[in-house]
């Protein structure tokens, strides 16, 4: 359950631990969210401005409160009870907010993203100013934003019968190409798209792989104003409801296959073998095993491959450590990122060995099943077994891998630019994302382009067919998307029975980093930098760097299980998943049962095909909108100047993040400070020579004395211990050594 209670236990020590729980004890079930946020801000201010000792604990303390604050803002609930602060995430699509209306929920979700948007806009100030005030021989981006009065007059003339609807609004698709310039303003089309993307409330996330960006323009406007923007990018690998819909999920596969007869079941398993052989053929195994092993793998062969993968990963980690700790300026770098060629080779050796072992294991299991004399009696039990589930999953993943990056795209950006949103411009953008022009542009751009990851695994260029047959998307809000609701393109406009429908497939869980602010990200990086200096954008590391940072930092900063760590990456921003099939045989094509897609129209004549979609939008959606009288006033009232991004940035509120630094001055005697605080501040703080020595080296030079024993015995008897003396006499050394096996964690230390 997403909304189960999870203990929030920071790994803090000494006074920092005591202070955290003192602050947390102020939080009850009835404490308002705003009050909780103020408590977090108060503690962050204390550790930044007032606390001047123990830099390591200061960093962790700030990071913990930043993370706690972001979780609260993302509608996590907190309550201190029996010495522990418990947190739970309300399911916005469930009972926790069943009385909340769609507008209220959308307003709440927008508020979560407002801070990160401000941080983002401040970072783009120079770009925004350049686009709005471009200088000589160029016109401002404002020229591409329609005036409300002008658009209102145009569509009103249609309503009164003065002009045809085809004359009033004339949409067309413009593919953004590198270095192309807009003929009306002289601005780069890529920068025009980028500017309008910054008007979105959601953060801009760049993803590696294939990307196609579009401007939707209005030729009826003197400057061909931008009606909307779209971006199609590589699909997310794991979306369960989508994979169920297509047939790539082993659970759905098994539920379907157990309903067929024995002969049909055997054919289905033979198809799985085809998937596996295709996957194996995509791996360069020349340095891993022989062709005979691939043909007839044994359990021993598979284990040797797994051992090889483990060794390769150890080598990769060592190469990465060497790069971080040593002088590697002269090391040849990989094209994948800021890593060495050696680290890259180790990465792909691991990937090849892992994938080959998994595929060969599945191949052996399924082939043994097919060849079994008692197949009819055992195949259903095979489907229910752990071995069978694993083998089926591996085969389906192999087939999905073949198409996920070449036959499918995700509509990650889709929306209208005001004032065209008032005439359902968003629906136009969504329809055009499935148009013949998009299918044509995709094939033209990627038909001869090798797949980077597949090519590296194969050891040679791999060019897969660039036949786009599926476009997916997710709504911004879980409460529904009017943009995709009831949205379909009837086949009748192309003289076919095949309708293109944006079909609701299911829901995503709220999972990711959208609720984590930039300040929190930087604070987590600062607090855990020793462990995370190898987090990068290189293929092979797993999820996005920000997601890995969040997960790893939670494990280091909080006393939590792996399941709890993952749950803290969740937020209440669930989304609806939609999908649109672009070919009559999309499923059979993606499942390898047919070799070519059967599109709904002749893609060679993509221009007229796309125009039919535009005509359909005008007659189905725009025309009905013209009969809604309030629209004219809303379009007329559109504030073009207020829409300019520069007018949405508070110039007096520049965002900044200050790293915590060790106090370098000698603290002065303060008569108001007593006890531990006086002792702690008497000297220069906690940073000593031993703070900067690795634990292994410290252990090597440590000599255990009676002092170690005396400290432990005193702590176990419930005493607080103060180590005092002269700087450099080994106090920090002793404390760091005792921390390794320290059991009395409630004991308080005042270093130096």
What is each PLM-predicted segment?
Residues 697-699, 724, 746:
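AAA+ P-loop NTPase catalytic core and its hallmark functional loops
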Residues 431-432, 737-741:
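Active-site signature of alpha/beta-hydrolase-fold catalytic machinery across serine-
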Residues 745-752:
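Conserved catalytic segments around the Walker B and adjacent sensor/switch elements
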Residues 660-718:
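A short, basic N-terminal segment
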Residues 212, 719, 747:
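Short coil/turn segments at beta-strand junctions that form active-site/ligand-binding loops
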Residues 440-444, 722-725, 749:
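Short, flexible/disordered secondary-structure transition segments
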Residues 718-736:
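Walker A/P-loop nucleotide-binding motif
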């Amino acid at each position: 359950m997403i909304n189960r209670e999870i203990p929030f236990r920071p790994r803090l020590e000494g006074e920092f631990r005591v202070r955290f729980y003192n602050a947390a004890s102020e939080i009850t079930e009835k404490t308002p969210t705003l009050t909780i946020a103020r408590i977090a801000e108060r503690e962050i201010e204390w550790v930044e401005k007032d606390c001047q000792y123990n830099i390591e604990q200061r960093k962790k303390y700030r990071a913990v409160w930043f993370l706690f604050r972001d979780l609260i803002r993302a509608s996590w609930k907190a309550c201190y009870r029996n010495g522990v602060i418990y947190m739970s995430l309300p399911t916005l699509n469930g009972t926790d907010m069943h009385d909340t209306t769609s507008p209220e929920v959308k307003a709440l979700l927008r508020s979560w993203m407002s801070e990160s948007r401000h941080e983002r806009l401040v970072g783009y100030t120079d770009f925004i100013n350049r686009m709005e005030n471009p200088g000589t021989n160029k016109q401002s981006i404002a020229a591409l934003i329609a005036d409300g009065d002008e658009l209102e007059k145009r569509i009103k003339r249609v309503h009164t019968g003065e002009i045809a609807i085809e004359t009033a609004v004339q949409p067309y698709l413009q593919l953004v190409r590198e270095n192309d310039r807009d003929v009306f303003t002289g601005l780069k089309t890529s920068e025009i798209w980028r500017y309008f993307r910054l008007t979105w409330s959601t953060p801009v996330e760049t993803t590696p792989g294939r990307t196609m960006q579009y401007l939707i323009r209005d030729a009826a406007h003197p400057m061909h104003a931008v009606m909307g923007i779209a971006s199609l990018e590589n699909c997310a690998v794991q979306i369960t409801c989508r994979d169920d819909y297509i047939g790539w999920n082993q659970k759905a596969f098994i539920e379907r296959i157990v309903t067929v007869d024995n002969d049909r079941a055997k054919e289905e398993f033979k198809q799985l073998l085809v998937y596996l052989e295709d996957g194996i053929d995509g791996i360069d195994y020349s340095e891993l095993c022989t062709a005979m092993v691939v043909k007839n793998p044994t359990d021993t062969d598979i284990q040797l491959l797994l051992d090889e993968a483990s060794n390769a990963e150890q080598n990769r980690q060592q190469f990465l450590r060497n790069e971080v700790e040593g002088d590697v300026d002269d090391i040849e770098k990989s094209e994948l990122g800021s890593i060495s060629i050696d680290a890259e080779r180790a990465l792909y050796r691991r990937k090849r060995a892992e994938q080959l072992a998994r595929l060969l294991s599945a191949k052996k299991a399924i082939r043994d099943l097919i060849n079994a004399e008692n197949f009819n009696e055992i195949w259903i039990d095979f489907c229910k077994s752990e071995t069978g589930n694993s083998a089926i999953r591996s085969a389906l993943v192999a087939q999905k891998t073949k198409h996920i990056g070449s036959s499918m795209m995700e509509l990650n950006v889709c929306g209208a630019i005001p004032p065209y949103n008032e005439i359902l411009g968003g629906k136009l953008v969504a329809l055009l994302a499935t148009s013949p022009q998009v299918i044509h542009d995709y094939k033209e751009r990627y038909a001869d382009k090798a797949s980077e990851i597949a090519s590296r695994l194969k050891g040679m260029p791999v060019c897969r067919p660039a036949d786009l047959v599926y476009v997916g998307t997710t709504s911004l809000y879980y409460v529904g998307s009017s943009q995709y609701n009831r949205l379909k393109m009837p086949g009748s406009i192309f003289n076919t029975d095949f309708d293109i429908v944006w079909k609701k497939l299911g829901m995503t869980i709220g999972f990711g980093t959208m609720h984590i602010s930039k300040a929190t990200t930087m604070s987590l990086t600062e607090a855990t930098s020793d462990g995370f200096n190898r987090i990068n954008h290189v293929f092979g590391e797993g999820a996005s760097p920000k997601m890995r940072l969040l997960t790893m930092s939670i494990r280091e900063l909080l006393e939590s299980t792996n399941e709890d760590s993952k749950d803290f990456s969740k937020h209440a921003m669930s989304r609806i998943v939609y999908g649109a099939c672009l070919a009559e045989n999309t499923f059979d094509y993606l499942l390898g049962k047919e070799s070519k897609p059967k599109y709904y129209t002749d893609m060679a004549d993509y221009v007229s095909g796309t125009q039919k979609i535009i005509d359909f939008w005008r007659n189905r959606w725009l025309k009905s909108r013209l009969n809604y009288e309030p629209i004219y006033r809303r379009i007329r009232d559109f504030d073009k100047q207020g829409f300019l991004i520069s007018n949405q940035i508070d110039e007096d509120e520049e965002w900044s993040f200050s790293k915590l630094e060790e106090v370098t001055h000698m603290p002065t005697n303060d008569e108001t400070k007593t006890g531990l605080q006086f002792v702690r501040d008497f000297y220069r703080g906690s940073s000593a020579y031993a703070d900067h020595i690795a634990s292994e080296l410290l252990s090597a030079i440590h000599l255990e004395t009676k002092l170690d024993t005396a400290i432990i015995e005193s702590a176990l008897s419930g005493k607080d211990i103060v180590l005092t003396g002269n700087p450099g006499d080994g106090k920090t050394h002793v404390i760091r050594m005792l921390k390794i096996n320290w059991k009395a964690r409630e004991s308080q230390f005042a270093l130096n």
